[in-house]
Amino acid sequence: MPELPEVETTRRGIDTVITGRTLRRLVVREARMRWPIPPALPDLLAGRTVLECGRRGKYLLLRFDHGVQIVHLGMSGSLRRVPEQEAPRKHGHVDWVFDHAVLRLHDPRRFGAVLWHPDEAGPIAAHPLLARLGIEPFDPRFDGRWLHAYFRGRRVAIKQALLAGDAVVGVGNIYASESLFRAGIDPRTAAQRVSAARCDRLAAAIRATLSDALDSGGSTLRDYVGASGEPGAYFAIHAAVYERAGLPCRVCGAPIRRLVQGQRATYFCPSCQKR
């Protein structure tokens, strides 16, 4: 699934292309996404100008003068610029057509979303998909004290607490494993047992891991590409544990282990990461 670095890389890639530009038309070839695309949406947006291209967690937020379009890339989606004359291939479900550019949403599994939040419905932050999201990892308020306060009384394993997204957003499966490795924390540790000092290390590790991923254009394991069609390079360059089961730890040489937590694969070094 595209995580925060992949979504932010996409946002940066399309921001200068569409912000301040008028949408000529929205072409919906397949409306059956995670939630059906509203049939009135093309008419609502035709001829309107994109005022801002934002992001909250893993959601892209395209601000128009009468509302916000919410775009989620789902499990396997990508949003990239394509030549206007390029015929849509299989799974090219939605096009945003501008005078100078076309953006295409490619989503093989159709778990993505293209939704509309009109201004009269209230602030976008109150939308049900966004209202309960945690703090952004690069928000100045996010630190070890924030995590330690959130983890107090939480018996769930630390990795699952990170994936929940209500403490801090955007730390999905890949980056949770990588961040816990950097912080030296066993992913099976109960969240409430992580000390304040270790929470400091974890907050720093999350920021460092996500920064590396952003600098690398995200991670590509299967389907993800950025707005220009380039795959992300983080996994190939930086991954210390993810999908390295049985291979030697890059720090101590012990075999990397794989386990399943909450139906998600977790990778860790049993020597470097302590409970």
Curated annotation (Swiss-Prot):
The protein, known as: Formamidopyrimidine-DNA glycosylase
Domain of life: Bacteria
EC number(s) recorded for this UniProt protein: 3.2.2.23, 4.2.99.18
Function: Involved in base excision repair of DNA damaged by oxidation or by mutagenic agents. Acts as a DNA glycosylase that recognizes and removes damaged bases. Has a preference for oxidized purines, such as 7,8-dihydro-8-oxoguanine (8-oxoG). Has AP (apurinic/apyrimidinic) lyase activity and introduces nicks in the DNA strand. Cleaves the DNA backbone by beta-delta elimination to generate a single-strand break at the site of the removed base with both 3'- and 5'-phosphates.
NCBIfam families in the record: fpg (TIGR00577), PRK01103.1 (NF002211)
Family: Belongs to the FPG family.
GO MF annotations, alphabetized: 8-oxo-7,8-dihydroguanine DNA N-glycosylase activity; class I DNA-(apurinic or apyrimidinic site) endonuclease activity; damaged DNA binding; zinc ion binding
Organism the protein comes from: Bordetella parapertussis (strain 12822 / ATCC BAA-587 / NCTC 13253)
Zinc finger FPG-type: from-to: 240-274
Gene3D superfamilies to which the protein is assigned, alphabetical: 1.10.8.50, MutM-like, N-terminal (3.20.190.10)
Pfam families: Fapy_DNA_glyco, H2TH, zf-FPG_IleRS
GO biological process: base-excision repair
